[in-house]
Swiss-Prot record:
Cellular localization per UniProt: Cell membrane
Keyword Transmembrane carried by entry: yes
TM region(s), chain numbering: 8-28, 42-62, 80-100, 116-136
Keyword Transmembrane among UniProt keywords: yes
Gene3D superfamilies in UniProt: 1.10.287.1260, 2.30.30.60, 3.30.70.100
Organismal lineage: Archaea, Methanobacteriati, Methanobacteriota, Methanomada group, Methanococci
Protein name per its UniProtKB record: Uncharacterized MscS family protein MJ0700
GO cellular component, one term: plasma membrane
InterPro entries for the chain: LSM_dom_sf, MS_channel_1st, MS_channel_C, MscS_beta-dom_sf, MscS_channel_2nd, MscS_channel_TM-2
Topology versus the membrane: Multi-pass membrane protein
Keyword vocabulary terms for this entry: Cell membrane, Membrane, Transmembrane, Transmembrane helix
Predominant subcellular localization, coarse grouping: membrane
Record GO biological process: transmembrane transport
Amino acid sequence: MIDNKLKLVIKVVLLIFLLHSLMSIFNLETYIKILAKYQNQIMIIAIIILSGLIIVDIASEVFKKYARTREEKAGEYLTLNYIFKYLVYVCVTLMIFGVIYQNVSSLVVSVGLIGAAVTYALQKPILNFAGWIIILYTRTIKIGDRIFIKNMGAGDVFDIDTQHIYLSELTTDTFEPTGRVLIIPNSYIFTASIENLTKGSPYIWDNIVVHFTLNSNINKAEKIVFESADEVIGNLMRELYEKWSKRKYLISRKLSDKPVVRVGITRSSFYIKALYLVNVYEKAKIRSEINKRILEKVNKENDVKLAYPHIKAVIETENKFKNT
């Protein structure tokens, strides 16, 4: 505690010394006269900046209030907040340039030169900014969406700014939280394939594959897998079928009111695959419950066995008799 106070005192003394040295070297009266000459412009710029900050602060509170009261559209309100905030910043910047450069031709030339230099030096940030504009305009991604980016990972979007998309990282197989944050440049919208798992509807097709030994009763195995999936997710699929079958733009053959079962064969087993609709946010929970029911049902059957990797050794013995 004493060391911190001592450091603070030293910094204050050093600051006073530096300011005194600066005043002795430069003629401050000259600079004060220059500032006084432009005092009106300085006051106008200060008022513009303060007004812009106040407007942004008030608007942010309004948008956040609506986001809290209408959770289903929270992402849209937060995105509108970003758009409004940066529009205010752009307007404030243009107004400041207008105050400084009263000559329009000088303003245009200055902005052109500055823009060319900035574009060359900040290519990636500008590309990220362009990606941000595309995201806001096309609404392909919004806060609250669950997305997957190839070779990057999956996660829930919790923030989007002018440069990056921020994700709460999830595992790519069961979408379990990892506790990490993925920061994705907005330019990926131009170069990478991004899967939005919740756009339009949070329901996706998931599947469970269960391998059985070749001598298991295939009919019982198929029944076990189907019934386990139907008991867990069947009611939801029937509700969605009733709801979606009334929509004209959906093709009826793509809908199903119950889990779909497929059978396949491998070199050492056969497998039953169950396909079903599930809320993407409950994928891990539903898969776990179906697996649990399958195990419970298999354990009750004598002629149904789960296959697993193993090696079976067959030893043949041969009796040899020698003539004595």
